[in-house]
């Protein structure tokens, strides 16, 4: 079980089971949303339990980004498919994950 949270702790989450290796995305949307590239992993939606209120921004016709409404931490990227992407930096350490 891996856990993570936003900066202020208002949103926490737990991930049961395997997570994908961390990937770096340099697309325009990721850079504009964070001011840098994004390092993210993902897991099946049904393996992620979120506690707290996440604000979702529809960043494209096919994807939305989840962040904490209090501190603004980028937490999730929700696009097509069975997995929800999780920003690697919000996971509690150590993760045991490696970058692909």
List each model region and its residues:
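A short Gly-Trp-Pro
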Residues: 1-100
